[in-house]
């Protein structure tokens, strides 16, 4: 936890959930999956080409996994890649992000000192240069590449892997929509979901719902409720247990956020709250929780992943337009819908082209839940049994009877 707070800027609250404590549940889950998995499947006897044959197929490890991980939730992603790979029988080379090398190296040290894995089964390679990952993506001895990061870098990983036809898992960017239907009685839950979800990782999460779609008939009411809730989660010292939102990871990331906020202003949007660095917080890369209203879905801030504590509020007329706006994105990683009618909410949720959906505040995160994206948000699934099977090959057998 101390390393995560110091390196990521994560709050104590985040470390007690998504940053450290919850990811630890990945370990026992995959132990149980491996123990109970059907490694061999009997297909029975069949007459084929004039002879009877006994057929079956078996699952075996894909081989050497190159795991390239991001800086936003490093322990979560490192474990989500290493543990299922080991459970499947693979060797792993972990390359953590330069901004969070300590977290990756600490995990490697824990594994080396507390398990009986032979040398070379788990390897951690740290480097200040992000391009160091290309040594792994280009190497023909790597059997699978598992990458979590931006869509821009994901394209480069996929291109590099094509030279050796290396299997690729990609979990990439997102611009997920939180849809609020017009029959919601109270915007309190909506506002809390939007604000506190954003605050947990200071908006630096690919699966966060950063586009808030609101019924035009209640737009002002909803915007006010969300702005009030966001004002209740100001940034603070992550070492203070009472702090709900820490700093951004780096000056580079804060500059990126500021650039997007300025682009929204330039395109005619309105800053409802936040929009600047907080006064008196010069140590650390802090930025105020920011809500931008009067946003059209074609604006840059509605189409591109900002990766900071910025939400955009987009109005819609009816359910059909809400679905259209939500799907009008190159991404498809996550999303949410709120309605006073659960069936109506589910009907909308099923029309959104995305890998995960929260209905009326439901939490989908868990070691047993497959996670991944549609469209340019990725290829394949992490977590769950599906995440285990990503690390397996299928070999079919036949013998005469």
Model region roles, listed by residue range:
Residues 91-93, 271, 356:
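A short hydrophobic/small-residue beta-strand
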Residues 152-296, 359:
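ALDH superfamily catalytic-core signature
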Residues 42-189, 316:
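Rossmann-like NAD(P) dinucleotide-binding subdomain of oxidoreductase/dehydrogenase enzymes
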Residues 1, 8, 12, 30-38, ...:
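Structural signal for hydrophobic packing residues in well-ordered secondary-structure cores
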Residues 4, 89, 122, 145, ...:
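Residue-level signal for inorganic ion chemistry
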Residues 1-53:
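N-terminal Rossmann-like NAD(P)+-binding subdomain of aldehyde/semialdehyde dehydrogenases
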Residues 116, 141-142, 179, 234, ...:
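Conserved C-terminal structural/oligomerization subdomain of aldehyde/semialdehyde dehydrogenase
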Residues 27, 104-107, 136, 157, ...:
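Hydrophobic packing residues within well-ordered alpha-helices of enzyme cores
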């Amino acid at each position: 936890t101390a390393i995560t707070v110091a390196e990521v800027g994560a709050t104590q609250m985040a470390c007690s959930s998504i940053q450290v404590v919850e990811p630890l549940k990945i370990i026992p889950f995959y132990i149980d999956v491996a123990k109970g998995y059907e490694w061999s499947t009997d297909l029975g006897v069949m007459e084929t080409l004039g002879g009877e044959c006994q057929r079956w197929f078996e699952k075996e490890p894909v081989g050497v996994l190159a795991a390239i991980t991001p800086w936003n939730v490093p322990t979560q992603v490192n474990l989500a890649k290493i543990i299922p790979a080991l459970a499947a029988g693979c060797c792993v080379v972990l390359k953590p992000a330069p901004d969070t090398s300590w977290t990756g190296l600490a995990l490697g040290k824990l594994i080396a000192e507390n398990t009986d894995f032979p040398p070379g089964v788990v390897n951690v390679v740290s480097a200040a240069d992000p391009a160091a990952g290309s040594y792994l993506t280009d190497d023909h001895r790597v059997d699978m590449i598992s990458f979590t990061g931006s869509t821009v870098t994901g394209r480069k990983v996929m291109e590099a892997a094509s030279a050796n036809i290396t299997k690729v898992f990609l979990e990439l960017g997102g611009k997920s929509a939180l849809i609020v239907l017009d029959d919601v009685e109270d915007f309190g839950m909506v506002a809390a979901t939007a604000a506190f979800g954003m605050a947990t990782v200071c908006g630096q999460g690919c699966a966060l719902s950063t586009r808030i779609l609101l019924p035009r008939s209640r737009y002002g009411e909803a915007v006010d409720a969300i702005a009030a809730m966001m004002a209740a989660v100001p940034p603070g010292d992550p070492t203070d247990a009472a702090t709900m939102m820490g700093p951004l990871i780096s000056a580079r990331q804060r500059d990126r956020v500021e650039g997007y906020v300025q682009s929204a202003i330039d395109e005619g949007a309105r800053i409802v709250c936040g929009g600047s660095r907080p006064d008196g917080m010069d140590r650390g890369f802090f930025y105020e929780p920011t809500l931008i209203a009067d946003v059209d879905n074609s604006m840059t801030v509605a189409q591109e992943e900002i990766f900071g504590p910025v939400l955009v509020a987009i109005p819609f007329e009816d359910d059909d337009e809400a679905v259209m706006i939500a799907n009008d994105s190159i991404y498809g990683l996550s999303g949410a819908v709120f309605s006073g009618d659960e069936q109506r909410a589910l009907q909308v949720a099923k029309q959104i082209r995305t890998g995960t959906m929260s209905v009326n505040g439901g939490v989908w995160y868990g070691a047993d839940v497959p996670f991944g994206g549609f469209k340019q948000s990725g290829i394949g699934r992490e977590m769950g049994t599906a995440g285990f099977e990503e690390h397996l090959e299928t070999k079919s057998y036949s013998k005469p009877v």
